[in-house]
Amino acid sequence: MRTRLTDRTRRLAAALGATACVIALASCSTESSPESSSPTSSAAPSESGAGTYLALGDSVPFGFRGGATADFSDAANFVGYPELVGEELDLDVVNASCPGETTASFMDTKAQSNGCDNSLQSGFGYRTAYPLHVLYESMDQSQLDFAVDTLTENEDVELVTLQIGANDAFICQQTTPTRCSDPADLQALAQTVQTNIDTILSTLRDEAGYDGQIVVVTYYALNYSDAFGAATQEIGDGIEQVAEANGADVADGYEAFRARAAEVGGDSVEAGLVLPNDVHPSDEGQRLLAEAVLAVAED
């Protein structure tokens, strides 16, 4: 069990930006072709002889960062914790994550996402405008379908991670009168996330026949001292129960940031773990998430 990252690995982490930034930028960008850059990995078997690590999820594992300096036309510019974990474990990374993915759009590309295939505000989809780290067979292939195909076609997958659900919360905030602060809305959100993650994990186990290690990564709180921070923990607890029911391990992203945030009153931004005016981890935040995965990864 590895729990520490090498200095070389630490330097690979990249800061991330807000999903709203990329939606705004992409709407007026001329570099909108997903073929403008080759994917950095694919579902093909490892050519190096090392095992494969399949990373699934949203903008956090994707390595998303926004802002005017981000080059969205080249997926290699975006590095998340899966690349840190892959280097530490000497595994080839197949990172199928998509910024803005929800638990529903993970299974069905026509379901509501928060910027992966579509968005509430503009209908913009990141994967229709810019390349991901992998090349999907078509725009209709969901991330779950990609995962099932990868697992059934390749026998060398040693690790799968899944981090999904935060964009469900952002959708809830945008579509409910109380911005998802009402207990009934929070309960409905938690139930939806748990039900969909249960379906995702059971599909990986049963349809794909994968019996290797799956690690579900829970989310950090933006602020551990406010009500939504407490709700993040409650949702994470529910995700943990679903993970365990499907024979998956849990990397506790909530606890990964908690102690450092507590030193500055609970604010993950003030602690340097989340980028200012953003929801995505800084390079240090990505490093802590990688260490959370490594803490439960099997040698």
Predicted features along the sequence, with ranges:
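Active-site segments of SGNH/GDSL-like serine hydrolases
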Residues: 163-168, 177, 200-233
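Structural recognition of the beta-strand scaffold that forms the well-ordered cores
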Residues: 52-57, 61-63, 92-97, 158-163, ...
